[in-house]
Every structure is written in C-alpha cells, then in structure tokens.
Amino acid sequence: MFDIQEELKKLPDKPGVYIMKDENGEIIYVGKAVVLKNRVRQYFQSLSNQTPKVRAMVAHIKEFEYIVTDTELEALILECNLIKKHRPKFNILLKDDKNYPYIKVTMNEDFPRILMTRRVEKDGAKYFGPYTSAYAVRETIDLVKKLFPVKTCSKVLPRDIGKGRPCLNYHIYQCLGPCQGNVSKEEYRFMMQDVCNFLGGRQEDIIKKLEKDMKEAADNLEFERAARIRDKINSLKHIAEKQKIISTAMEDQDVIAFAKSETDSCIQVFFIRGGKLIGREHFILEGTSDVSDSELMTAFVKQFYSSAAYVPGQIILQEDIDEMEIIEKWLSGKRGTKTYIKVPRRGEKLKLVEMVSKNALIELNQFKERIKKEAALAKEGMEKLKELLNLDRLPRRIEAYDISNTGSTEIVGSMVVFENGSPKKSDYRRFKIKSINVQNDYQSMQEVIFRRLKRAQKEMTEKDEGGGKDVGEKGAGFGTLPDVLLVDGGTGHVNAVRSVLEELDFNIPVYGMVKDDNHRTRGLVTGEREFDLSKDIVLLRFVTAIQDEAHRFALEYNRKLRAKRYSGSVLDNIEGVGPKRKKELIRHFGSVKAIKEAEPGEIAKVKGISRDLAQKIYDYFRQQE
C-alpha cells in the first residue's frame, strides 16, 4: 500500500521530475521541479488555494514516482520527453502531437532524398517542420520537385548507378540523372543544399546563385540551359514575392500568440526568416479550460520545441513564461548558438504578436465551428441509422470489424469504435488470427468476435466481483458492449458472426457493410435483406466513414506485420547483425532483396559492417539458395 504522507517525507532536496499515477497505475501528470521536496508537497497542502483542475488531479493521485537529475536543465528535457511519451490527461497537450509530420532531407546519404516522416532522429538528416497536416507536407515536396531536379525514383544509390535506363524525368530535365552517373555525389549534394535553403526560406541566396549560373550558361552559348535556369529564377521570385515582409529586423524569428475560449485554445506560430513570413502553423491544445495564460504558453513552448526541427535565434511570445531562463538555456543548446525569448510591450514586435493573435482567434473559431458541424452530422447519422434498422435505442457505441491478409500470411482483424458518432481510438483493438493459417474470412471474423466477446464476459465478471471498470471509463476496453455491430462483408459474414453471438449468448444487432462494383459502400445487409443507403447522403457518408476506418486500421496492421517479416526475420538470423546494423543495412540498400544480391565489398561499405561480417552476410544468403 502506497502511503503518500510517508513518501512525501522521503523526497530529496534536488532537481528532478515527478510522475503522478492514479489507482490503475496510469500516469496522469508529469512535472519538473528545482527542488522535488518543495514542489511535490505543494500539491497536498492547502488545496483551497489550488485551481479546480489541480484539485481534480490531486483527487485522482494514488501514488507518485520521481527521478532525480543533476541539473534543472536535465529535468526540463526529461519532463518534455515523458509528456510526449505518456500524454498524461492532466498535462496541457498538443492535440495529436505524436502525429505531426515533417519534411526530411537525407543529407546523411551520398545522394540525399526528400520525403515525409513523423519521427525526428539524430541521424545527420535535415528536418523541417512540424507541419499540422500531411497534405501541407506533400504539397511542399511537390513544389520542391517542380523547382529542383531531385530524383524521385526508388533506385538505391550508389548501388544502382548504371543499372537500367533513365526515367522520363531525366529526359524532360526534371532530374539530373544520378542513376546514370551523370552527376557526381558532390554536385548532387550541392543541389540538395539549395533545397534545404529553399525549405528554410533562403530564396534570395538561391536566386543569386542561379543568376550567376544563368549568365555563365549564356556566355557559353548554352541558351537552352540558360532559359531553364531563367524559368526557375522567375518561379522562385514569384514565391518570394508572396512571402510578405513583416519585420524590418532581417533575422530569424518565431512569433507565437494564442486565443482562448471556455473549453479550447489555439496557438498560432508565424515563421519569419530574414524578415519574411515563410509559413505559419496553428495548434489546438487540450485541457486548457482552467489554466493561466502563462501556464498555457509555457506548456506550448516546451512541447513544440522539444520536437521542432529548427530553433531560430529569437522567439517572440505574447505572454511571459515560467522558467524563462532555463528554457532559453535549453533552446540555445538545441540551436547551437544563443536563442533569445522576448515578450514585447510596444513597437513593431508587439504589432507582430497582435497580428498572430488575431489569426489564432480566426483559427479557433473555425475549429469550433467545424467541431459543431461534425457533432451535428454524427448525431444525425446515428438517428438515421436507428430509424433505418429499427433499433431499440440510439447506437451510441458502434463497433466495426474487418479482416486483412496477404494470402495465407499476416491474417489480421481490426475492431474500430465509434462513440456518439465519432472515432474513439483509445478503444480500437487489433487481432492476429491464431486459429487458422489459410485465407478464410468467415472463420477469421468468427475468431475475432469470439475473442472480443470472451474478454467482455471476463471483464463483466470482474466488475460483478468489484474489480472491473464502469462503462465509459478510460481503459474499460472490452467490458463495454456495442449497441450495434458492423462487419465488412455480406450475408455470409453476418451469419458467421451470429453463430458466435448465439454460442456466447449475446443479443447484439449485427449487419454487414457491402460495397458496389467500384468498391464503394453500397448498403447494410442482414441475413434476410439489404438496406440501400444511396438515397440518404448523410447516412451513406456516416457508414462509409466507419467502413473505411475499419479497413484502414486492419490494412495498417497487415502492412506492419508484412514489413516486419520481410525486413527483419532474415537479418535477425545472422550472427553479429543486431538492431543498429540491421537498420544501417536496410537504410543503405533499401530492402533485404538488395542485400541478398550485393557483393561482400559493397556490404562492407555500410556503416558498422566489417569485411568479415560482410562476408558472413554474403555467405548466409548463398547457403539459403
């Protein structure tokens, strides 16, 4: 039994991070302290002086842990990492923070590539972002490919140089043709550095360089090449003209301001490079109904810059933040040179902050309006589904199932949950099919439903005995039964599931989601009839969203298992090839198939692979033939 009062006496007079947990051992809050003893004790003393949010959190605390650090800076870094990892419900959180995409330029490779990623690693690559949508990333990458002749094929270089013919892009001057050896590693990297400068808002530097190249081409009577360079210069100038000059200080700045409502907050960031606005992003924050402006801004700065790809020399804020000195020190360490945090009270910088704040308010109002519309459509969808299927009650909890496989391997099932018409991702579940190893959708679906309902029986029994969770409680999982059950498939799937429901004595309505010849949702079927959805666009979209989500979730798991089998299993069998070397091999060659076809000398070029190990890898694949 954890005795909080006794444990409070043991707290040290040192900096560190404290971790609050509830009765289920779930982390509900993470914080940092200059002196752990003083900070943690404050939560349990004079609660009347605390905010309602803090009082609510303390009521849930059943135990706490702490990690001592040598310095306050170390505590700050650890706090940021733990919040990002565990996303505790009483911390202020960026909405879906873990999913923000970045642009990655693989400057750690001989012939760098440009791609989208959701993970920032210390691997020598250059990262730009975060962006708030994958669409924005893809749009930017497409623009880069129009302006710069970067390679877009899947060839692994330098391994594939000279293998095969060049693609169409090479012939229309949209690629330099590194796969043909037409450009050296140094020349290609030089061009990719221009790409990085462009993504960083340094168009003027690129334009000056291109104007010099254009003059040189014209002097050498290479008029076609000069014309292509001229067109690229015009495109870059057009982009630069659209980037409004909003600061007379020709330096790199991030300007951050916010807008708040009773329940939500929106923070807007303007990215200013060389005095020009090169981009902006907005972020919705959860759990801000009862926090001060300073607390809100502090939490955002910590979370945003803990994963930001770039830290500018100056960060301009709307509001003072706590621990400004230590946060400045942390950001300067990430940047490599000094970063200054400023909160302007007058002048040009204050006007900048006010402009960003107005934009944050616009984004917040649009967000609230969108949420309102989505809730109304979800409610209408549930009501129409109840009416169409003649259900006894509104289907507030809908569970949908799908099966995905690669022939007779990677057979998996998905369970997605829609609660009050919206996805409840915390209740999603994945199933790896165990009872069969052949492609059989009916049996696979039966296994998934059987396992799900057996778990429900177990949890309901535990609840009756006093150990379970209530319906709707976080972590309730399988103990919460659906109002309606939807499966991807037709009458055969419905009948297969009904036999399981009867066997386990559950009375849950079940329907199959069927598609037309174009693989689009058409209707719902029972064993006896089909309900046509085409006449009601709201209901059709509602069911389509559920079916698509079930399919996406199943396919995602199938691909994950398939990738693991292809990229991991063979290399794992080779002595001396651990996780790091395996990662380097895949990064260099692109696939296990390419490693298998490589000669020992080529394998030995991979970082961390000796000549002896390269020979061992080569011999292993020869023995498997």
Curated annotation (Swiss-Prot):
GO molecular function, one term: DNA binding
Domain UVR intervals: 204-239
InterPro entries assigned: GIY-YIG_endonuc, GIY-YIG_endonuc_sf, GIY-YIG_UvrC_Cho, Hlx-hairpin-Hlx_DNA-bd_motif, RuvA_2-like, UVR_dom, UVR_dom_sf, UvrABC_protein_C
Major location (coarse): cytoplasm
Stored SUPFAM superfamilies: C-terminal UvrC-binding domain of UvrB, GIY-YIG endonuclease, RuvA domain 2-like
GO CC terms: cytoplasm; excinuclease repair complex
Pfam families membership: GIY-YIG (PF01541), HHH_5 (PF14520), UVR (PF02151), UvrC_RNaseH (PF22920), UvrC_RNaseH_dom (PF08459)
CDD domains found in the cross-reference section: GIY-YIG_UvrC_Cho
Keyword DNA repair in record: yes
Record GO biological process: nucleotide-excision repair; SOS response
Location in or out of the cell: Cytoplasm
Keyword DNA damage: yes
Every GIY-YIG domain range: 13-92
SMART domains given in the database record: GIYc, HhH1
Entry keyword set: Cytoplasm, DNA damage, DNA excision, DNA repair, Excision nuclease, SOS response
Domain of life (superkingdom): Bacteria
Protein family (similarity comment): Belongs to the UvrC family.
Cited function: The UvrABC repair system catalyzes the recognition and processing of DNA lesions. UvrC both incises the 5' and 3' sides of the lesion. The N-terminal half is responsible for the 3' incision and the C-terminal half is responsible for the 5' incision.
Subunit-structure text: Interacts with UvrB in an incision complex.
Protein name according to UniProt: UvrABC system protein C
Lineage: Bacteria, Bacillati, Bacillota, Clostridia, Eubacteriales
